[in-house]
Amino acid sequence: MRLNAEFLSQVPSFISPLKETELDLRWYQIPIIENLGVLRDVHDAIDFTDNDIRYLGNFPRMKRLQTLLCGNNRITAIAPDIGKVLPNLKTLSLAQNHLQEIADLDPLASCPQLTNLSCIDNPVAQKQYYRLYLIWRIPSLHILDFERVRRNERLRAEEVFGQIQNPTEIASSIMGVKSRVFDLAALVQSHPEANSPITTGYTLTPEEREKIKEAIKNASSIAEINRLEAMLLEGKIPK
């Protein structure tokens, strides 16, 4: 199911037990987040539980949104601008997804209001330093995986990882390991048809596909690869 304007206009909203205006997008097999600008930022919460989303990104600026439920999807990457476009996000559920490395969660450090985060049943949750690193990297957190963040954990995190501006070797080593979550060339080649799930509203021309493949081939760093991943999944073409 694609998130087009007609579909979004028919999706039910309701007042949740937390007194939030919530949009219910559960169980629609949604592959990509798109076209949310038509909602006009009138929701406090959006529930994307039980879909097929792989990339947590492509949001318009939504100042009202405080709760985002994305459990049981296929998410492997988070947009680096998530804190900029969702500045008041407080609660985020990423339970039962495919997040692999601790540094894959680094974009959440840009969310200044994030107090409640769940990443249980992701491979990353089994990593050494997972909990301690997130407490250090996201100082606003009060609850992580349904457990309250304690003062002694904050002190221990600072002891292990140092200051954000001056991280220890352990912190730097964690920051340097990020999943190469997609083979972009394979994605482009495997979705040549119109209305591909990796685009947002138009078909890639042969020239655009070649441009993307050339950009991938010339990428010189993981950061550049990640930038190209984000551009492709948001339907943007490298210049």
UniProtKB/Swiss-Prot annotation:
Keywords: Leucine-rich repeat, mRNA processing, mRNA splicing, Nucleus, Repeat, Spliceosome. It comes from the Eukaryota. LRR repeats lie at residues 19-40, 42-63, 64-85, 88-109. Residues 122-160 form the LRRCT domain. PROSITE patterns: LRR. Its main location: nucleus. InterPro entries: Leu-rich_rpt (IPR001611), LRR_dom_sf (IPR032675), RU2A (IPR044640). It is found in: Nucleus. The keyword Amino-acid biosynthesis does not apply. Belongs to the U2 small nuclear ribonucleoprotein A family. Belongs to the 40S cdc5-associated complex (or cwf complex), a spliceosome sub-complex reminiscent of a late-stage spliceosome composed of the U2, U5 and U6 snRNAs and at least brr2, cdc5, cwf2/prp3, cwf3/syf1, cwf4/syf3, cwf5/ecm2, spp42/cwf6, cwf7/spf27, cwf8, cwf9, cwf10, cwf11, cwf12, prp45/cwf13, cwf14, cwf15, cwf16, cwf17, cwf18, cwf19, cwf20, cwf21, cwf22, cwf23, cwf24, cwf25, cwf26, cyp7/cwf27, cwf28, cwf29/ist3, lea1, msl1, prp5/cwf1, prp10, prp12/sap130, prp17, prp22, sap61, sap62, sap114, sap145, slu7, smb1, smd1, smd3, smf1, smg1 and syf2. Involved in pre-mRNA splicing. This protein is associated with sn-RNP U2. It helps the A' protein to bind stem loop IV of U2 snRNA. This is U2 small nuclear ribonucleoprotein A'. It comes from Schizosaccharomyces pombe (strain 972 / ATCC 24843). The lineage of its organism: Eukaryota, Fungi, Dikarya, Ascomycota, Taphrinomycotina.
